[in-house]
C-alpha cells in the first residue's frame, strides 16, 4: 500500500513529515496521470498544482477556512484529499464526480466554478459576509495568470484594495491559460518574475540600517522614498497600487517555502496576493512539452499520449479551414478569439494571417466590442467562441453590435450538449438569448460540410450573424450539404406525409436516423432542416398548415425561446389546428455525462424521436 492509499481527508495529512510530502507529490501525479488517461479530464493544469495544493492543506484548515478555485479545473488534488479519491473512477461521468468544484458534492467545496475570472469576486463576497457576521477564518482565492487577464478579476481587485478586506489571493502563474497567455498584464507578470532582486535589496537595506544608530535615525526618511526606489527596480506595482499587498514570486513546487508564506499571510489583516510560479504539466514529459495539448484531454494512451478515440473531422476544424479559405480571398476578414485559438479552430488562421488575427485573452466582452469597432470601420470580423462563453458578452452583442446592425459574425462552437464538463459548459442557451435580439440572423449547419457555405453567407451578409455548431463531427455521413443559402429558407431533407419533423443542426441527423427506423415500420415523416432559426421559414410553415401535418420540433437547446418557441408562436398567429410537440431541454441545467447518454436521458435520441412521431401518426 502506498502513502496516498492511506490518505482520504485533510486531517490525515497532518501526520506527514517533509519526506512524506515529496513521496506524496510523486504518488499524486502518478494517480492523476493513470486516472485521467482512463476517464479524460483536465490534466496539465492539475499536474502543475500538486505542491501548491499540498501547501494549502499544510497551512490552512478547510474544516473552517474557505477556498474558491478560479475556473475550478485545477481542483483535482483538492478533491482527492477531501474524500473523493475513489470517485475518480467516474470522473466527469454521468452520476460521477464533477471535474469542477460543486457545493452539492462535498462540504469542502464552498463555491461552484467553471468559468474564468470569478474567484476573487466570490471569495471577497464570502470574506465580507464573514466580517459582517463577526466570524474568524481565512478566505482564499486561487486564480491563474490567464484568468487574471479577465476584466471581472480586475474589477474585483479594484474593490478588494479599496475596502481593504482581509483576503488571501494566490496567483498560480504558469504562463498559460488554455493556450499561451497574451496581453499587457501577461507581460507585466513576466517582469514580476525578476522582482526578487527588489525584495533582496529591500531586506539588505533594512538590515544595514537597523544595525547602526545613524540608520535608525534616517530610516523614516528613507521610507519616504522607498516607493520611488521600488518603482525603479520593479517595472510596475500594479497590485500594490490597487491596495493589495504583493508577495512573491515563489517557487510553486517548493512546499516548505509556500507553506511558510501562507502561514504568514494568515496574520496579515489586509488583502494580499501571493505570486506562485508553477509548471503546467509537471511530472509527465509529454504534458510538459505540450501543455496546451494536455490541458483537457479525452482518454489516452499513457506511453504515446495519443487519444484513444479514432481521429475524425470536426466542426471546429471545418470552420477553421473554411475561414482560412475565405480569408485568402478577402483581406477585410479578421479573426478574434478570447484565449482559445486551438479549441475554436483558429490556429491555422493565426499562422497564415498574423496581422488579421487577434487573441484578446480571457475577455469575451472586450472581444465583442472590439469586433463591433472593426466592423464599424469596414472590416469583416469573425469572433470564434464557445457557446457557454458567449453568454458572458450578452450586453455587448445587444448594445454594441445589434443596435448598430454591425456586420459581426459570431462563430459559436460547442453549441448544444458538450458532455463531461457539465452545467457550466453546456451550450444550450444561445438560440434562446440570441433570438430575442433584433437585427441578428441565426444559421445552423446540419452537417459539417455545410459550415463553409453558411460561413461565406454570414460574412457577406452585412449584418450581425450567428453560426452555431456542436462539439465533434457528423453522426451520419449520408446528408448532402445545401448548395445555396436563401435567407430564411429551410430545406426539405425528406418528403413524407402526415407528420413533419422540423429539426435544426445536429438534430437533423437524429431525425434522419429516426426516419430510417420509422420507414421500416411503414411510416415516412417529412424531415425539414431549419437552416435558419432566425428568421424562420414562414412560407413553409404556412404550407405545412395547409397540408394538415402534425409537427415535431427538435433542437439541442432549451425549448423556451428557441426553435420550438418560434415555430409555435407563428403557428398560433396563423391559427394552426394540428398537434405540435417540441423536443429540447426544459427549464433546468444539464449535468455532466457522455453526450449519447445525455441525449437519451433528455429524449433526444432516435428511439424517443421515433416513439413521438408514431404517436403523432395516431
UniProtKB/Swiss-Prot annotation:
Thiamine diphosphate binds at residues 73, 114-116, 146-147, 174, 284, 364. Transmembrane segments: none annotated. It catalyses: D-glyceraldehyde 3-phosphate + pyruvate + H(+) = 1-deoxy-D-xylulose 5-phosphate + CO2. InterPro entries: Dxylulose-5-P_synthase, THDP-binding, Transketo_C/PFOR_II, Transketolase-like_Pyr-bd, Transketolase_C, Transketolase_CS. One of its GO terms (molecular function) is magnesium ion binding. Pathway: Metabolic intermediate biosynthesis; 1-deoxy-D-xylulose 5-phosphate biosynthesis; 1-deoxy-D-xylulose 5-phosphate from D-glyceraldehyde 3-phosphate and pyruvate: step 1/1. Mg(2+) binds at residues 145, 174. GO terms for biological process: 1-deoxy-D-xylulose 5-phosphate biosynthetic process; isopentenyl diphosphate biosynthetic process, methylerythritol 4-phosphate pathway; terpenoid biosynthetic process; thiamine biosynthetic process. Pfam families: DXP_synthase_N (PF13292), Transket_pyr (PF02779), Transketolase_C (PF02780). Its EC number is 2.2.1.7. Its cofactor is Mg(2+); thiamine diphosphate. It is an enzyme of class 2 (transferase). Coiled coil: none annotated. One of its GO terms (cellular component) is cytosol. SMART domains: Transket_pyr. Keywords: Isoprene biosynthesis, Magnesium, Metal-binding, Thiamine biosynthesis, Thiamine pyrophosphate, Transferase. Binds 1 Mg(2+) ion per subunit. Homodimer. PANTHER family: 1-D-DEOXYXYLULOSE 5-PHOSPHATE SYNTHASE-RELATED (PTHR43322), 1-DEOXY-D-XYLULOSE-5-PHOSPHATE SYNTHASE, CHLOROPLASTIC (PTHR43322:SF5). Belongs to the transketolase family. DXPS subfamily. Catalyzes the acyloin condensation reaction between C atoms 2 and 3 of pyruvate and glyceraldehyde 3-phosphate to yield 1-deoxy-D-xylulose-5-phosphate (DXP). This is 1-deoxy-D-xylulose-5-phosphate synthase. It comes from Clostridium beijerinckii (strain ATCC 51743 / NCIMB 8052). The gene is dxs.
Amino acid at each position: 500500500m502506498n502513502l496516498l492509499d492511506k490518505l482520504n481527508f485533510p486531517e490525515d495529512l497532518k501526520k506527514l513529515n517533509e519526506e512524506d510530502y515529496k513521496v506524496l507529490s510523486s504518488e499524486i501525479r502518478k494517480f492523476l496521470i493513470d486516472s485521467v488517461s482512463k476517464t479524460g479530464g483536465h490534466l496539465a493544469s492539475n499536474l502543475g498544482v500538486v505542491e501548491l495544493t499540498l501547501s494549502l492543506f499544510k497551512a490552512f484548515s478547510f474544516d473552517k477556512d474557505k477556498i474558491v478555485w478560479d475556473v475550478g479545473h485545477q481542483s483535482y488534488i483538492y478533491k482527492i484529499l477531501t474524500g473523493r479519491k475513489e470517485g475518480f473512477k467516474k470522473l466527469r461521468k454521468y452520476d460521477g464526480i464533477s471535474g469542477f468544484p460543486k457545493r452539492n458534492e462535498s462540504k469542502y467545496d464552498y463555491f461552484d466554478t467553471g468559468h474564468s475570472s470569478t474567484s476573487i469576486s466570490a471569495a471577497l463576497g464570502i470574506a465580507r459576509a464573514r466580517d459582517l457576521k463577526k466570524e474568524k477564518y481565512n478566505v482564499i482565492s486561487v486564480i491563474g495568470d490567464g484568468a487574471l487577464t479577465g476584466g471581472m478579476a480586475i474589477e474585483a481587485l479594484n474593490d478588494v484594495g479599496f475596502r481593504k478586506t482581509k483576503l488571501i489571493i494566490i496567483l498560480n502563474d504558469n504562463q498559460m491559460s488554455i493556450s499561451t497567455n497574451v496581453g499587457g498584464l501577461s507581460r507585466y507578470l513576466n517582469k514580476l518574475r525578476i522582482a526578487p532582486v527588489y525584495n533582496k535589496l529591500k531586506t539588505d537595506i533594512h538590515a544595514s540600517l537597523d544595525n547602526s544608530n545613524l540608520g535608525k535615525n534616517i530610516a523614516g526618511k528613507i521610507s519616504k522614498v522607498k516607493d520611488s526606489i521600488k518603482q525603479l527596480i520593479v517595472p510596475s506595482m500594479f497590485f500594490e497600487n490597487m491596495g493589495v499587498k504583493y508577495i512573491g514570486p515563489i517557487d510553486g513546487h517548493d512546499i516548505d517555502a509556500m507553506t511558510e508564506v501562507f502561514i504568514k499571510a494568515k496574520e496579515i489583516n489586509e488583502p494580499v496576493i501571493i505570486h506562485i510560479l508553477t509548471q503546467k504539466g509537471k511530472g509527465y514529459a509529454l504534458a510538459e512539452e505540450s501543455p496546451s495539448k494536455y490541458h483537457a484531454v479525452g482518454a489516452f494512451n499513457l506511453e504515446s499520449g495519443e487519444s484513444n478515440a479514432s481521429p475524425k473531422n470536426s466542426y471546429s476544424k471545418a470552420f477553421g479551414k473554411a475561414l482560412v479559405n475565405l480569408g485568402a480571398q478577402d483581406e477585410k476578414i479578421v479573426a478574434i478569439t478570447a484565449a482559445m485559438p486551438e479549441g475554436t479552430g483558429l490556429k491555422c488562421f493565426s499562422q497564415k494571417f498574423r496581422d488579421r488575427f487577434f487573441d484578446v485573452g480571457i475577455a469575451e466582452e472586450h472581444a465583442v466590442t472590439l469586433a463591433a469597432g472593426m466592423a464599424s470601420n469596414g472590416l469583416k470580423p469573425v469572433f470564434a467562441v464557445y457557446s457557454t462563453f458567449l453568454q458572458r458578452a450578452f450586453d455587448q452583442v445587444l448594445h454594441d453590435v445589434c443596435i448598430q446592425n454591425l456586420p459581426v459574425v459570431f462563430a459559436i462552437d460547442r453549441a448544444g450538449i458538450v458532455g463531461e464538463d457539465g452545467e457550466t459548459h453546456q451550450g444550450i442557451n444561445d438560440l434562446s438569448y440570441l433570438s430575442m435580439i433584433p437585427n441578428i440572423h441565426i444559421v445552423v449547419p446540419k452537417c459539417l460540410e455545410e459550415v463553409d457555405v453558411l460561413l461565406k453567407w454570414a460574412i457577406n451578409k452585412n449584418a450581425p450573424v450567428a453560426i452555431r455548431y456542436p462539439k465533434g463531427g457528423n453522426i451520419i455521413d449520408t446528408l448532402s450539404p445545401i448548395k445555396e443559402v436563401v435567407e430564411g429558407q429551410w430545406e426539405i431533407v425528406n418528403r413524407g406525409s402526415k407528420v413533419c419533423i422540423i429539426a435544426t443542426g445536429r438534430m437533423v441527423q437524429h431525425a434522419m436516423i429516426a426516419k430510417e427506423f420509422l420507414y421500416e415500420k411503414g411510416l415516412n415523416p417529412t424531415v425539414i432542416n431549419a437552416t435558419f432559426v432566425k428568421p424562420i421559414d414562414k412560407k413553409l410553415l404556412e404550407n405545412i398548415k395547409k397540408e394538415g401535418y402534425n409537427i415535431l420540433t427538435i433542437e439541442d437547446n432549451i425549448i423556451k425561446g428557441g426553435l420550438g418557441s418560434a415555430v409555435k408562436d407563428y403557428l398560433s398567429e396563423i391559427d394552426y389546428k394540428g398537434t405540435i410537440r417540441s423536443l429540447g431541454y426544459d427549464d433546468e441545467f444539464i449535468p455532466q455525462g457522455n453526450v449519447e447518454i445525455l441525449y437519451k436521458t433528455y429524449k433526444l435520441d432516435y428511439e424517443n424521436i421515433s416513439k413521438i412521431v408514431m404517436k403523432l401518426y395516431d
